[in-house]
Amino acid sequence: MDKLIELADFVVTKQSLSRYERGIMRPHANVISALAKALDISEDYFLGTNILIDMPMLRTTSGGKLQEDVLTAIEARLAYWTERLLAKERTVGISGEFRNPIEDFQVSSLEDAIQAADLLRRLWHCGDGPIASVLRLLERKGIRIMEDELPAGVYGLSTWADRRLPLIVLDLREDKTTVERLRFTAAHELAHLLLSFPPSPDLSVEKRCNKFASFFLFPKSAFIEEMGGEHRDELTLGEMTDLKELYGVSIAAQVHEAWDLRMISREHYDWWYDENIKKNKMEEGWGVYTFPETVGREKRINSIIKRMEE
């Protein structure tokens, strides 16, 4: 709170902020302007929002990389955006209720993550082949995705609105991420939303989300078939580039998956990372997944509203 007061050029006190939060008093125009500037949101946000964002989960999925004032700004933008989107959906008569098909699925191990990924694919009728657009799949299933510019090192966040509406925040800037990483980030945040994570001394929650994302994008059975067997002496750049362009999965993720399945030796895994991947983190020249990864729900709704107003 002290940081927010400082960012707002000290035009508001801690006591006043507390009263605003509890609805006891409303801020004056100059205070609204200063707070909106500090939080990088529209002044319209302070006209009121009835959306409750799960701030603890937003904090958790940031991995501790964001300061509280940055999280507060993201929360404000997310609440404002969500309320406007839901209002648009009501206007055009489009609903998007969400149901978690693997609710209470507990992931403690690599094998649990593989099973959860396979089960969700089966329940969502994805088969075991490539998923053309991960973002469009998530939107179709009722998950709202907001585009936002996130700080360095943070590619995505996830949380709930009113304890019923799943939200994912993604940074889609091409100079920051690759399409393959974007797909992986979306699947990683999906894990945070759908799965339960009992305490585990072996795998952190973030690593378990990574395992789920990897095997959701490239299922174990398909990966083994594409690689021609359960064990390989070495993996070649040419074959993984081909699979990257087909499955939308990075070279790095494929090498990780091969090691997770003990398809390759630790020595070969280390060679790939130390001599190749660490030297080319954006994987330039190693193929590109060309199917567009975009969000489209709000754009389609806006087109319907525009037509209604003509």
Regions found by a protein language model. Give the residues of each.
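Active-site hotspot residues in diverse enzymes, especially metal/ion-binding acidic/histidine motifs
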Residues: 1-310
